[in-house]
């Protein structure tokens, strides 16, 4: 069965987006395509229709391919928890926590078995598999236990593209150095080089490309220009780069950049709004006076809550809320807004009872059982009757202590979230809540009303359509500069 692989000289070379673009380009040719990443380390996750957890990047690639995301597309997901530990998600289910030095000893064999099983299933269901590597395939200290790079390519005998970020500088050294560190059987799989994030005129680069091809015997199959668009990111470090000021912005939203922030793809739809400026606020930053503050999800809610309190930002958020500011919490952020979080089993590695922000009269109990499911419900607030979709990824259950009529359910299922009658405090377990265009606009209009701004129209669709346009724009931008014909013809 035909398969391609994309590996990179470094992290952040653009593997995920180029893989997504290839998936869309093959789909346009009429093929049924599946993305694949054997092992991903990320805190942005997605829940499949079967209730399994995979990396959000593989879900994005599946949407690019026009297929439903499944757990086979990312059989191993590692979710860092700090202190060199990660939660291990195997075939969609969390199976434990492990230290970095223990991971390969405990999970290498079972992990490779899961990868092979997943590939076998994808081969049965699809015409093409487009595989993505992780980091670099030439990490000498890790190669013997690398599950997700050229071991996969060798298993599939997949021709492989070696991608380099030319914007960082040193791209020729990166490519030659990577090749030199590969074993001969690995090197034979590299069928083309791709330069990514190029700024400038290709003719000024041509002499270097000619030298590279002559030196290695491997063709340069792509020089892809810098694409100045906002695409989903897997690394919270990239949030530091999202500092563009919008001249037409009328509303500012401060998202707290927790040390272990998770699922920050929740805010892509907000960033797509021309009238909204999203500002990511670190623990040492000033909160300022935004129109709303959002507490996002976290992989280690208790540790992030303690860091938030130690930094003084927790008190700043309480003061902001007391002055009538709008605060919205998603998942772990929702849990933080309550009275207490109780983790009597040490689910996150710390046992005990912990003070929340006391914005909601709620208690949250952590248990080993993890809630993973897609949800469909109907909104009650800020606009009743809106159909809502999203997904839950959380450990712990939250209960409202008070029978006070001051707090109301946001959705038909009261367990999914609540708000106060004034519309100042909001909390929900639903990831993807802002993907619901009408609900997003209704919530933004509540902020705009306070500033005396005209309401935005709410008759807009789901963010899925906008995301699909974004994928098309990505693929259109890549297609003229990436020559896949030699690989496709050979296969």
Swiss-Prot record:
Family annotation (InterPro entries): Class_I_gatase-like, CobQ/CobB/MinD/ParA_Nub-bd_dom, CobQ_GATase1, CobQ_N, CobQ_synth, GATase_3, P-loop_NTPase
Provide the active-site residues from the annotation: 331, 431
Q: Mind telling me which CDD domains this protein's record contains? A: CobQ_N, GATase1_CobQ
Pfam family membership, one: CbiA
Residues in GATase cobBQ-type domain copies = 250-439
Q: Does the keyword ATP-binding apply?
A: no
Pathway assigned to this chain's UniProt record: Cofactor biosynthesis; adenosylcobalamin biosynthesis
- The chain's coiled-coil residues are none
Q: Which HAMAP family has this protein been placed in?
A: CobQ (MF_00028)
Entry similarity comment: Belongs to the CobB/CobQ family. CobQ subfamily.
* Matches recorded under NCBIfam families: cobQ, PRK00784.1
Briefly state the protein's biological role: Catalyzes amidations at positions B, D, E, and G on adenosylcobyrinic A,C-diamide. NH(2) groups are provided by glutamine, and one molecule of ATP is hydrogenolyzed for each amidation.
Protein name, as recorded: Cobyric acid synthase
């Amino acid at each position: 069965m035909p398969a391609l692989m994309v590996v990179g000289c470094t992290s952040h070379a653009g593997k995920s987006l180029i893989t997504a673009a290839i998936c869309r380009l093959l789909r346009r040719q009429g093929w049924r395509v599946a993305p694949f990443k054997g092992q991903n380390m990320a805190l942005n996750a997605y829940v499949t229709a079967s209730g399994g957890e995979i990396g959000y990047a593989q879900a994005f690639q599946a949407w690019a391919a026009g297929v439903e995301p499944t757990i086979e597309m990312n059989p191993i997901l590692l979710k860092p928890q700090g202190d060199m530990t990660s939660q291990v998600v195997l075939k969609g289910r969390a199976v434990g926590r492990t230290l970095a030095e223990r991971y390969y000893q405990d999970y290498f064999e079972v992990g490779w078995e899961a990868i092979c099983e997943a590939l076998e299933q994808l081969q049965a269901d699809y015409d093409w598999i487009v595989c993505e590597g992780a980091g670099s395939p030439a990490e000498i200290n890790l190669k013997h236990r690398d599950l997700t790079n050229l071991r996969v390519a060798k298993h599939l005998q997949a021709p492989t593209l070696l991608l380099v970020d030319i914007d960082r500088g040193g791209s020729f050294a990166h490519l030659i150095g990577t090749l030199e560190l590969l074993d001969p059987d690995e090197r034979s799989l590299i069928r083309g080089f791709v330069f990514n994030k190029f700024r400038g005129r290709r003719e000024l680069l041509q002499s270097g490309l000619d030298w590279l091809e002559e030196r290695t015997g491997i063709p340069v199959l792509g020089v892809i220009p810098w694409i100045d668009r906002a695409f989903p990111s897997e690394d919270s470090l990239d949030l530091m780069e999202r500092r563009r000021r919008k001249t037409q912005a009328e509303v500012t939203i401060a998202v707290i950049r927790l040390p272990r922030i998770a699922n920050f793809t929740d805010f892509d739809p907000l960033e797509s709004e021309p009238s909204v400026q999203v500002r990511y606020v670190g623990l040492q930053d000033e909160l300022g006076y935004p129109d709303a503050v959002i507490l996002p999800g976290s992989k280690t809610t208790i540790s992030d809550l303690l860091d938030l309190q130690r930094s003084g930002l927790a008190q700043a958020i309480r003061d902001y809320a007391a002055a009538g500011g709008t605060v919205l919490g998603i998942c772990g952020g929702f849990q933080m807004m309550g009275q207490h979080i109780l983790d009597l089993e040490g689910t996150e590695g710390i046992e005990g009872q912990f003070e929340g922000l006391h914005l909601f009269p709620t208690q949250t109990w952590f248990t080993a059982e993890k809630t993973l499911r897609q949800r469909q419900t109907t909104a009650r607030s800020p606009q009743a009757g809106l159909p809502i979709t999203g997904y839950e990824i959380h450990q712990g259950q939250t209960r409202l202590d008070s029978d006070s009529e001051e707090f109301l359910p946001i959705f038909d299922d009261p367990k999914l979230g609540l708000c106060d009658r004034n519309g100042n405090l909001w909390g929900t377990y639903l990831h993807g809540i802002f993907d619901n265009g009408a609900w997003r606009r209704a919530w933004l209009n509540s902020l705009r009303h306070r500033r005396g701004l005209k309401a935005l129209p709410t008759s807009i669709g789901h963010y899925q359509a906008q995301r699909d346009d974004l994928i098309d724009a990505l693929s259109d931008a890549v297609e003229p500069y990436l020559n896949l014909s030699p690989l496709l013809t050979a296969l």
